[in-house]
C-alpha cells in the first residue's frame, strides 16, 4: 500500500498586529486589587421629594401661578363689565360715561351669582339727553339679575345726582322753550332765595322762576316778571310752557326715577333723583341689548 499523504495542515492564524495591553502582574506577595463600583446616584425626582424646602417652593410656585391666573381673569372680566355698563349709559344719556363695579366681592363671583353689590357711573358733562352741559353721577346697589317673566331682575337702590351749570340751563332754555328762547341772553342763579333769573337783552325783560319738586317731578314756578317780560310774556302763557319744559326733561328717565330734592347754587342747579326695588324690564331697547 502506498504511503498516505499527511493531512493538510490548518492555515496558521497570523498573530494580532495590535495586541490588547494587559495590566501588569501584581507584585509577588500582594493581593490583587478589587474594583468597587460606586452605588447608583438616586434619581432627581426622588431627591426632590425627600427635600422639604423643595416641596415648599413647588407648592408656593403652583399657588402663585393659580393666583396670577385668577387675578388676571378678574381684571379682564371687570374691564369688560365696566365697558358694557359705560356703553349702555352713553347710549341712554348721549354722552361719554365711565363705570366701575364695587371691589368686594370679586367681580367674577358677582357675575357667577348674578348679584352685584354696587356700581358707580359718571358722565362727561356734555349733556344728559336734552339738558346741555348736565353731568350725571349714579350710584346703583343690590342688583339682582335673577329675572322672572317680563322682568330681567331688580335694582335695590339707584341714586342719581344731576349737576346743571347756569350756562347749560340757558342753552337748554333757548333750544326748548320757544316763547323764551329768543329773549334769554343771560341767566343767573341765586342760592339765597333758590331762584333762577332769566334776563333779556339789555335787561329790558326779566323772568324769575323757582325750581321745585312736585309729585316726584320738577317744576319751574314763575315768581316775577319785570320790564318787557311783563308785557310780552303774560304769566298765564309762560307757566304752561315752563311746565312742559320741565316735564320733557324728566319724562324719559328710566326705572321710575323720581325727584327727591333740587338745590339752587351760585353756579347752577343740583337735582337728586332716586328709585328703590325697581324692576328691570325686558325690552328691545338697543342701549341694553349687550348687557
Give residue ranges: language-model regions.
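Solvent-exposed coil/turn segments that connect beta secondary-structure elements
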Residues: 104, 124-126, 141-143, 201-203, ...
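Soluble extracytoplasmic domains of inner/organellar membrane proteins
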Residues: 170-239
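Terminal targeting segments of Actinobacterial cell-envelope proteins
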Residues: 1-59, 63
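Hydrophobic alpha-helical membrane segments, chiefly transmembrane helices and signal peptide h-regions
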Residues: 54-75, 99, 271
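N-terminal beta-strand/beta-hairpin edge segment
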Residues: 4, 96-170, 174-183, 191-196
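Extracytoplasmic/luminal low-complexity segments enriched in Pro/Gly and acidic/polar residues
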Residues: 236-291
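Short extracytoplasmic/periplasmic juxtamembrane "stem" segments immediately C-terminal to an N-terminal membrane anchor
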Residues: 83-102
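Aromatic-capped interface at the extracytoplasmic side
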Residues: 70-87
Amino acid at each position: 500500500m502506498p504511503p498516505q499523504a499527511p493531512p493538510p495542515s490548518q492555515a496558521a492564524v497570523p498573530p494580532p498586529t495590535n495586541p490588547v495591553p494587559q495590566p501588569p502582574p501584581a507584585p509577588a506577595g500582594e493581593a490583587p486589587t478589587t474594583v468597587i463600583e460606586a452605588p447608583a446616584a438616586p434619581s432627581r425626582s426622588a431627591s426632590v421629594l425627600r427635600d422639604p424646602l423643595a416641596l415648599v417652593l413647588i407648592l408656593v410656585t403652583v399657588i402663585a401661578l393659580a393666583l396670577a391666573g385668577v387675578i388676571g381673569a378678574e381684571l379682564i372680566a371687570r374691564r369688560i363689565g365696566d365697558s358694557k355698563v359705560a356703553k349702555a349709559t352713553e347710549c341712554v344719556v348721549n354722552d361719554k360715561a365711565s363705570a366701575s363695579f364695587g371691589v368686594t366681592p370679586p367681580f367674577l363671583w358677582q357675575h357667577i351669582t348674578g348679584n352685584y353689590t354696587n356700581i358707580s357711573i359718571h358722565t362727561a358733562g356734555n349733556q344728559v339727553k336734552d339738558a346741555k352741559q348736565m353731568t350725571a353721577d349714579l350710584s346703583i346697589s343690590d342688583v339682582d339679575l335673577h329675572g322672572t317673566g317680563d322682568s330681567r331682575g331688580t335694582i335695590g337702590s339707584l341714586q342719581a345726582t344731576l349737576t346743571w351749570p347756569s350756562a347749560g340751563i340757558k342753552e337748554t332754555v333757548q333750544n326748548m322753550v320757544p316763547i323764551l328762547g329768543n329773549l334769554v341772553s343771560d341767566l343767573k342763579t341765586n342760592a339765597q332765595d333758590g331762584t333762577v333769573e332769566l334776563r333779556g337783552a339789555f335787561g329790558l325783560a326779566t323772568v324769575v322762576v323757582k325750581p321745585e319738586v312736585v309729585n316726584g317731578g320738577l317744576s319751574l314756578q314763575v315768581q316775577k316778571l319785570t320790564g318787557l317780560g311783563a308785557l310780552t310774556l303774560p304769566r298765564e302763557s309762560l307757566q304752561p310752557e315752563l311746565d312742559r319744559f320741565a316735564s320733557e326733561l324728566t319724562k324719559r328717565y328710566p326705572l321710575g326715577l323720581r325727584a327727591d330734592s333740587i338745590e339752587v347754587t351760585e353756579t347752577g342747579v343740583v337735582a337728586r333723583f332716586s328709585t328703590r326695588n325697581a324692576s328691570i324690564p325686558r325690552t328691545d331697547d338697543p342701549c341694553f341689548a349687550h348687557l
